[in-house]
């Protein structure tokens, strides 16, 4: 992927006009059709963005809402999914309320009932993560069906979902979905996409006029973009296709289960990931007595040459570990040894 990006920059620097056109052709003829097919969408429903954060802002700021309209989000949103709604509240008088969702998730029915309990006559939309920063996997299809039956728009943050397991956007039934390609999809930094369901377009007002080469309504800025980076998505998509997302799902789950087994050997370790159907295959979250999660981040980089993420939600002083297909059991063993060493300091 890195070499594909470099090749693109060499091409566009050597021959600016033809190099750019060749890259644009690769984007429109290979990247966009493959992206749509991979995620169960029509090409016209997808706009390329620089990341999920940009896509989340675009979907949030373009949604047709009036002063006093209400949107429900959850207490587990990433800041990138929370801040755009604060902009809508400040600029347009939209009421944004948080639905408390416990960590770990209890059940599909519990998640649905918590949303249902908060709906009022002013509620117009619900917004939530497909997979949270802590690795909790929301029942997206059930939530989107719930929203549609009540005439509500559903907006999903898929930054931590795409690439961990197969995602079919039409099957999920969401109205908008934002994703990053540089995380689990092996894409170059600076790539993501926004999906807006065709039947929901009248609820999302685009901020930009479509360019001459547009395949549909533009929700992301037209004009000159980072074409070498976007064209390199063809390489990352082909790589993921060779792996097979079902195989990625299985491998990530295998490594995550091995990690959980090793963590269970540590005294005072509490797993917070929840059951398999409500947790992402490659994300494990836990709390370890005697270990400060914030302080452990630099310690584990030093002791185990491993980057981890702290997770502070619902009073938990937790740690998140992400295991992708390229990780090994030996690396997990080194991490667990590092955790024990860090706790003893």
Question: Which residues are covered by each model-predicted region?
Answer:
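Pyridoxal 5′-phosphate
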Residues: 1-345
């Amino acid at each position: 992927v890195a070499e594909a990006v470099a090749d693109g920059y060499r091409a566009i620097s050597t021959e600016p006009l033809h190099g750019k056109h060749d890259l644009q052709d690769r984007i429109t003829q290979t990247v966009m059709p493959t992206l749509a097919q991979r995620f169960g969408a029509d090409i016209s429903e997808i706009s390329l963005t620089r990341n999920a954060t940009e896509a989340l802002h675009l979907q949030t700021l373009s949604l047709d809402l009036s002063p006093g309209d209400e949107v429900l989000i959850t207490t587990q949103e990433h800041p990138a999914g929370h801040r755009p709604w604060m902009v809508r509240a400040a600029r347009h008088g939209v009421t944004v309320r948080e639905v408390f969702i416990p960590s770990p998730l209890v059940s599909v029915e519990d998640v649905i009932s918590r949303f249902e309990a908060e709906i009022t006559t002013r509620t117009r939309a619900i917004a939530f993560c497909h997979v949270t920063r802590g690795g909790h996997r929301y029942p997206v299809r059930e939530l989107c069906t719930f929203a549609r039956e009540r005439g509500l728009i559903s907006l999903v943050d898929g930054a931590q979902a795409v690439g961990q397991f197969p995602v079919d956007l039409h099957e999920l039934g969401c109205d908008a979905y934002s994703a990053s390609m540089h995380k689990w999809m092996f894409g170059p930094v600076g790539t993501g996409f926004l999906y807006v369901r065709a039947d929901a377009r009248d609820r999302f007002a685009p901020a930009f006029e479509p360019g001459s080469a547009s395949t549909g309504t533009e929700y992301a800025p037209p004009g000159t973009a980072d074409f070498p980076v976007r064209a390199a998505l063809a390489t990352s998509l082909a790589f993921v296709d060779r792996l097979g997302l079902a195989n990625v799902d299985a491998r990530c789950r295998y490594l995550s289960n091995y990690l959980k087994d090793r963590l269970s050997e540590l005294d005072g370790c509490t797993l917070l990931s929840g059951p398999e159907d409500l947790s992402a295959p490659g994300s494990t979250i836990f709390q370890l007595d005697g270990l400060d999660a914030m302080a452990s981040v630099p310690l584990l980089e030093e002791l185990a040459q491993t980057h981890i993420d702290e997770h502070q939600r619902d009073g938990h002083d937790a740690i998140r570990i992400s295991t992708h297909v390229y990780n090994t059991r030996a690396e997990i063993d080194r991490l667990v040894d590092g955790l024990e060493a860090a706790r003893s300091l």
